[in-house]
Amino acid sequence: MSDEEDYAEYMMSEEDMSSFEMDVDSDVEPDDAGLEQDQQVTGDDYDGSAGNSGDSMAAVEKQCESWYDTGKAFKNDDQFEEARKWFMKCHASPIWWFKSLKQIIKSDLSQGLRVNERLREMFELVSTKKEMIGEESYIYGSVKRLINRIVPDLNSHLLFTERLRQSSIDVSTLMERQRYLDILEKSVADMDQELRDLVTIRKIVYCVWIHVLRWEQIPKETLEDLHENVNLETYFILLQLHVRTFVDEDIVHLIELVKVVDEMGRFMTNSLSVSQIPTVTSVYHFARFLTLWKSTDHYNQSQMLSKCEGELTSCFQDLEAIGGTERDGLMLTRFSLMGIVFCHLLLNDKTKLVPFELEQIKVLEADELVVLLQELYQCWLDMDIYALEQCLLQLEDFYSPWYNVMIEKIIALCQSNKLWKRIAPTYSCIALQDLMAKLETGNTITMNRDQLLTLLMKSIAKDTADVYYKLDLVEDYVYFGEEYFVPLRSEELNIVNPLSQQMGSEIIGKDEWLCNVSNWHKPKVPKKLSAIEFMDYMKAARVTISQTNLAHHEPTVTSFLLKLSTITHAQLTQNSSSLASTN
């Protein structure tokens, strides 16, 4: 069996889903009293009169085959009662009775009837007359297909079923099918391991689904069973449960999620067919986004955001491959689409492709969510905080609480852009109170004094400030302009250590050292470097400064700091009157 055929056993077809949603009526067996009397001799007559005659058995087989074909034709026309009459005539031949029982069970399922007794009868036939039915591979294959028909796989629909559709699913029907699994578990106990594993895993999955539909917490024992049964189906449902918990509660058990993602990655690597199933790959890429977003092991935030955007784009493209209205209703479609746009805004990189230029998003340009996201994107470009607030309020119906962190970062970045690109180049002096008013709306987007001072200081530290400034914290003013770009002077060094005026004068001539601590020239921060490249850059800078110091026999930073550390608290107190604030 190919990988595609093998995985097909795990996916629910439309026919399976429709039969799953049918109501269960009753377990009354059909009335056989009106069976049509056939003029030919019945199988029982053959069995009683022909004995061991080979010709008689061949005739029985041929007659039963004819009855089976007739019943199958009636079943294909949805004439289930008539079909059942013909199938019931095939008792005399074990192989044709086995086939007939399968068709009767399928007919009962189509009519919403219980199949408990028919199942027991079929498995009793298999246990007593297995050799007369056929090879084990044929029997086990038939049983496997029948199991998937009676208790279809619900796994792929756990995350991809809208809440309204979930509420329409009859939980009692699901519980009835779970009871079939109890019968199947006993019946396949003596069969091959594949069938036993299939029934065991299916029981766990149905148990999870029942708790999900009831909005109940999944028992710890059930989750442990999922982890213990290493299987594509169990890992896929675990992946979906992690995603669902994150979306609903903003909770991620990162260590467990990383393990499940790694296992799913191995399944996809080892099976080309599995790696091409969009329902699987879309959840996988979204889960990889979660591991990146929630991980704290990031030295380069831009690199992390770029990877997040890539995973969400892959997720959205896989969802688009599902196609049709089903895709439009998927929960992940909305979240991945918003995540792509949000990550793009946070990257703040004009060289990257605008998300709305993607073909998969272009086809949805009339969608309400896409229209809102385009408005949000334009407000962000215009640095219009009031319009941005209105867009975010309209988006509240679409996103889950976990997006709040992203949105807070987007608002902060928009405020920073407006400060340095609109306000600072325009004003030479502005009161802090007026500046705060320009960076807030008074409703959901706020800016207090501490936040503003933090923004100003961080902008200098991160080299995102486009204009030099000076703070007057006595009068609460901020001054912008190139004139506030001044080097450190020797008398200002005296403020730090009044006893080291001579040493300060020596150091002030060492502009290499001043450049290294960002006091003389404009701060220079290496952009888009990995952690290793950044450390190499810093090492090279230190070597250059050390060699220059040795060549001129001038004091180094280390010697200055060592001397500075010998100042006593009393010495500093005596000279406290000379302390003043710097730019």
Curated annotation (Swiss-Prot):
User: Where found, per UniProt?
Assistant: Cytoplasm; Nucleus
Taxonomically, which superkingdom?
Eukaryota
* Swiss-Prot/TrEMBL keywords: Cytoplasm, Nucleus, Signalosome
Q: Where is this region: Disordered?
A: 1-55
> InterPro entries, from UniProt?
PCI_dom
> Biased composition, Acidic residues: where in the chain?
1-35
List GO terms (cellular component aspect).
Answer: COP9 signalosome; cytoplasm
Which PROSITE patterns is this protein grouped with? PCI
Could you tell me which residue ranges the PCI domain spans?
297-485
The subunit structure is: Component of a COP9 signalosome-like (CSN) complex.
What is the recorded function of this protein according to its Swiss-Prot or TrEMBL entry?
Answer: Component of the COP9 signalosome (CSN) complex that acts as an regulator of the ubiquitin (Ubl) conjugation pathway by mediating the deneddylation of the cullin subunit of SCF-type E3 ubiquitin-protein ligase complexes. The CSN complex is involved in the regulation of the mating pheromone response.
Give the protein's recorded name: COP9 signalosome complex subunit 10
This chain's source organism reads: Kluyveromyces lactis (strain ATCC 8585 / CBS 2359 / DSM 70799 / NBRC 1267 / NRRL Y-1140 / WM37)
- Give the gene that encodes this protein: RRI2
